[in-house]
Each structure stands twice: as structure tokens, then as C-alpha cells.
């Protein structure tokens, strides 16, 4: 690697232009995607409680699929962004082919399981026969979206690694409009169409996913052809014996990221179960406060995605001092953005809560929860972009896996269980315990970042 002398913080205007362009578009894409899920919940909630609960149960399965898809996509970005820095698009093509084959294999396994034992899978999350029946009807169609989503997400990740992001926002908007229109028509039976209930929601989601995949395939095939992904010999390249090293290189990066994602994904239902044993007022307050928190979290995730591309490209270009300078700049910006987001959440909590009809007790608890989450937002806005964006994007994929394993299952889950069921602490402290990892993760993340041992050349 080159060791060009640079300033402590980068002064390269192109760095800031690239970072904020990537961050803004990815944030808008994620915001629209999150709104799609909210729209489904609102419409199904207006139709029937069992339909809403059935869809929520199926979404627990999709949550696992989503984490696997994101993990594979993040692994692809970590390697391909370095190749993009070297302008070696043929290697990006080979890696994308390997990642695509892995995504299809995982999706096929999940779809097969959903086909062969839907009741058993849904029974993991609920014992209600009514909810399982609704969930089975929903899953019958929705399972096919798992395959479509994993392919689309993988192609979007590949484009992000070469700094192409606008198409992902366009796709999300088209998906939102398509899903919303079909849901309105088929869930309730408007405009002469049959009233299909939860099956109508499944049709809307499936149609939107099919349209997403069609748009991204046409875009990669005919419009943005720098990677030439869909050449006729793609299948041969994926399985060619001489390209086994590509598979090994990808799996070496992808496996720790997938493990890290699963460590976190499995903990989420358990955290939900702990909070679900609180009072009805506390559950309602947590639901409201979490909604606002999730909208701001979209920005933090976008910062992580943009950081991974910028750092990976820097490493691919081979200037180690620039990698350090850009990393320092990103880490400070992450903290400052976190303070801004936390301040917004804290200051606007009154007007936001006024939109909901809550009991007096629930309103007070929601106010307290948002204050807690404002503090959490500062920690999360630093540790997530630095650990996932800078460190993982810099090629160190094992650090986050070990950190999540220790923090989630060694500290947060036991602490949350003790706070809720043994010590019987006030609900505010239980919520603080559940979210506490977002704060103390900052210490190992800072120490790892300052060591610069995360700079790994993967190409």
C-alpha cells in the first residue's frame, strides 16, 4: 500500500460529496422501505386484529431472511468496494455471481421449509390457532418473495459497491406505490375486486417484489453495464473450478458477517418477549417510542452503508494514510450526527407523542422511553457506523461477530432478564437494559478503530 502523507481529517471535497450522496440516497431508500412495512401494518390493522397478528408472525421469519440478505450484501460490498478502488470490474462480476448463488441457495432452503412445515414454523412464534391460520394463508404467497428479495438486495448491494445508488431509491418508491395500491384494492375489496384480507396483502407484496426484481435486472443488464453481470457465461464463471478461490475469499468474509447478523436477529424476538411481559401501558409506550427511534435509525444504517463503500474503495486504491484520515473523519462525523439526531428526538418528543391517544400512564412512560432512546441514539450513531461501516467495511469482519456475541448474549440478554424478572426494576430501567449495548459497544469499537488493525486488504 502507498503511504501518502495526509491531514488528520480529510480535506478532500470529493470525499464529502461521495459520502453524503451515498448516505442521502440510501437513507431515502431505507425510509421508503420502512414505510412499506408500516403501510402493511396500518392496512391489515384496519382490516382485523388476527390478520395483523398473522402477518406480524410471518414477518418474524422474513426478519431472519432479511438479516441473511443484508449480511451477504454487506460482505459483497466489503470486498467489491476494494476491487472498485482498483477498477477491477471482472472480479466484482465473479464475486457477485458467487454471492448470487449463495443467496439463491439460502432462499431455496427457506422456501422449502415454509412449504413443507408452515404450521411448525409459525408455531415457534405463537400458539393461537386463529393467528397461525391467518399466517399460513399469508405465508403461502409471501414465501416466494424471500427468493425475489434476496436476489434484488444482492444486486442493489453490488451496485452500491460501485457507487450506484439512485436506482435503489427509485425501486423503493415504485414498490411502495405498487404495494399500497394493491393492498388497498385487494385487502378491502375496492373497485369491484374480491375482498381477500390477508391474502390480498400477500398478493400486493409479491407483485411489488416481482416488479423490484424486474427493474433491477433490466438496469444491471441494459443500462448500467460496467460490471457486465448477465453475460451468457455467468453460470460457467460461478462454478468454474479455477474460480474456487473466489468462493473461498467470499465465504471467508461473508461467514462472520452472517453469524453477526444471526446473533443479533435471534436476540430481537427474545428482547421483544421480555418487554412483552411488562404492563399494557409499558408495551404501548414502547411501541410508540420505538417507531420514532426506528425512523432515525434508518439514517444511521445509511451512514454505515456509505462508510463501508468509501473505506473499501480507499483500501482498494492502496493509500493507507488516506484510509486512516477518512476513517477518523467518518468517526467524528458519526458522533456529531448522533448528537443532532438525539437532540431532535428529545426536543420533538412532545409534539410527536401528541399524535397518539395514550393513557396518562402510557404517555408518561413513552416520554421517559424517548428520553432514554435519545441517549441511546448518540451511542448507536457512533458505534454502528464505525463498527459496520469503517471496521467491517475495512475488511475486519470478525470483530463485529465477537463483539455482538459477547455484548448481546454475555451482557444484554442476562442483564435484561435480571432487570425484568429477578430484580423487578422499573420499566424505564428494563428498557435501558435492553438498549444498553448501543452505549458500551462504543468502548471496544473506539479501541479497535484507533488500533488501525481493521485495515485488511481483501483483494
Regions found by a protein language model. Name each.
Residues 21-40, 141, 152, 175, ...:
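Transmembrane helical elements of multi-pass membrane transporters/channels
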Residues 73, 142-161, 168-179, 201-217, ...:
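Short runs within selected transmembrane alpha-helices of multi-pass transporters and secretion channels
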Amino acid at each position: 500500500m502507498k503511504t501518502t502523507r495526509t491531514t488528520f481529517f480529510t480535506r478532500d471535497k470529493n470525499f464529502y460529496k461521495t459520502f453524503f450522496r451515498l448516505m442521502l440516497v440510501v437513507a431515502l431508500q431505507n425510509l421508503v422501505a420502512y414505510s412499506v412495512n408500516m403501510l402493511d401494518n396500518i392496512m391489515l390493522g384496519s382490516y382485523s386484529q388476527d390478520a395483523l397478528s398473522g402477518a406480524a408472525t410471518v414477518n418474524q421469519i422474513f426478519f431472519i431472511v432479511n438479516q441473511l440478505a443484508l449480511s451477504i450484501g454487506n460482505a459483497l460490498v466489503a470486498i467489491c468496494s476494494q476491487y472498485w478502488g482498483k477498477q477491477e470490474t471482472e472480479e466484482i462480476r465473479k464475486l457477485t455471481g458467487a454471492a448470487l448463488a449463495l443467496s439463491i441457495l439460502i432462499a431455496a432452503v427457506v422456501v422449502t421449509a415454509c412449504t413443507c412445515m408452515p404450521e411448525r414454523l409459525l408455531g415457534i412464534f405463537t400458539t393461537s390457532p386463529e393467528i397461525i391460520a391467518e399466517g399460513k394463508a399469508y405465508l403461502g404467497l409471501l414465501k416466494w418473495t424471500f427468493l425475489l428479495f434476496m436476489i434484488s438486495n444482492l444486486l442493489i448491494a453490488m451496485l452500491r459497491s460501485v457507487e450506484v445508488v439512485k436506482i435503489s431509491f427509485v425501486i423503493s418508491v415504485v414498490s411502495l406505490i405498487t404495494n399500497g395500491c394493491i393492498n388497498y384494492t385487494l385487502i378491502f375489496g375496492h373497485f369491484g375486486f374480491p375482498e381477500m384480507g390477508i391474502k390480498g396483502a400477500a398478493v400486493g407484496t409479491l407483485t411489488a417484489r416481482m416488479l423490484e426484481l424486474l427493474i433491477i435486472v433490466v438496469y444491471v443488464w441494459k443500462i448500467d453495464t460496467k460490471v457486465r453481470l448477465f453475460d451468457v457465461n455467468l453460470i460457467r464463471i460461478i462454478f468454474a473450478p479455477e474460480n474456487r478461490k473466489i468462493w473461498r475469499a467470499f465465504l471467508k468474509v461473508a461467514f462472520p458477517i452472517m453469524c453477526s447478523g444471526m446473533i443479533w436477529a435471534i436476540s430481537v424476538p427474545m428482547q421483544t418477549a421480555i418487554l412483552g411481559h411488562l404492563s399494557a401501558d409499558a408495551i404501548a409506550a414502547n411501541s410508540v417510542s420505538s417507531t420514532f427511534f426506528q425512523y432515525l435509525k434508518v439514517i444511521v444504517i445509511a451512514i454505515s452503508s456509505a462508510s463501508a463503500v468509501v473505506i473499501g474503495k480507499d483500501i482498494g486504491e492502496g493509500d493507507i494514510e488516506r484510509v486512516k484520515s477518512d476513517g477518523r473523519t467518518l468517526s467524528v462525523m458519526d458522533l456529531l450526527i448522533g448528537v443532532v439526531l438525539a437532540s431532535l428526538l428529545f426536543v420533538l418528543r412532545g409534539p410527536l407523542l401528541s399524535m397518539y391517544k395514550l393513557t396518562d400512564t402510557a404517555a408518561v412512560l413513552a416520554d421517559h422511553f424517548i428520553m432514554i432512546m435519545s441517549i441511546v441514539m448518540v451511542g448507536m450513531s457512533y458505534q454502528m457506523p464505525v463498527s459496520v461501516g469503517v471496521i467491517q467495511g475495512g475488511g475486519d469482519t470478525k470483530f463485529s461477530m465477537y463483539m455482538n456475541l459477547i455484548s448481546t448474549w454475555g451482557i444484554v440478554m442476562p442483564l435484561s432478564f435480571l432487570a425484568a424478572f429477578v430484580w423487578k426494576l422499573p420499566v424505564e430501567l428494563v428498557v435501558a437494559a435492553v438498549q444498553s449495548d448501543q452505549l458500551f459497544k462504543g468502548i471496544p469499537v473506539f479501541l479497535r478503530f484507533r488500533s488501525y488493525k481493521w485495515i485488511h486488504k481483501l483483494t
